[in-house]
């Protein structure tokens, strides 16, 4: 008998999930008392280094990994309390794609996409019709008769995505699905996933170790370390103001600000002998990323500046600008106006 839980907006609720692996020597706590809620239609990212517990956690969503403790609620149903027959029904509504495409080399593209439908009571004509619809959806309608060996990595992943959608799932789990792809192909796959999210109202749970992937596609993110979620929230909030060291490290890999600061401090050519300089890192968000705050500062305080580093990221549709500036001028100007200058800067931080 299915155990129904009132969940109006959340399609996934993981409550107090713990996964223990035991051997003769020790007990490994792969997932440690994790709570996670994913809203219907969201693109939710889970980021962490290898061994953080990301894959183990998401495999509990369809009980491919049964948790030692905790509740797994999908579409309002506590799926730990249902029988195998009903669990198969739930699993049909959860598609999965992986880093390795796992296509069958002996089957054509069409045959690979049809495969999940073979255990359904669907005749051959309808199976093929569904597979052709999916091929068109992922942009591979010209490769119906091709075999996996004839496809590029990006094309293989598109076939894998189409296959994962065969049973009209409401949830798609993406486990490092772009890790084996080059940057250009990764971008095209992420664009496809965003498109599918909008067209099908498909909830996507995406695992990655790359912040670039998170900022490109996700609306919300959880950061994992040692089996725990250590930080969670909107991607823009996490990107603007990470509170944990691991999160900051991931953000730094995407912005390159940390490396730029180290390079600037180390390099003497940025220093002007006899001139007082102050190095400032500015972060601009939203509309302020396009405002002329620096020119306003220069005009108001008669202070010179040199832009040593600048870039603008787009995170979940929001512009976030990063700038490292060396302000220079007479000591008295710098000292007398420094607090006013900082006030102007921080007024434009958010």
UniProtKB/Swiss-Prot annotation:
Keywords: Amino-acid transport, ATP-binding, Cell membrane, Membrane, Nucleotide-binding, Translocase, Transport. It is a peripheral membrane protein. Belongs to the ABC transporter superfamily. Methionine importer (TC 3.A.1.24) family. The complex is composed of two ATP-binding proteins (MetN), two transmembrane proteins (MetI) and a solute-binding protein (MetQ). This is Methionine import ATP-binding protein MetN 1. The gene is metN1. Pfam families: ABC_tran, NIL. Part of the ABC transporter complex MetNIQ involved in methionine import. Responsible for energy coupling to the transport system. Its EC number is 7.4.2.11.
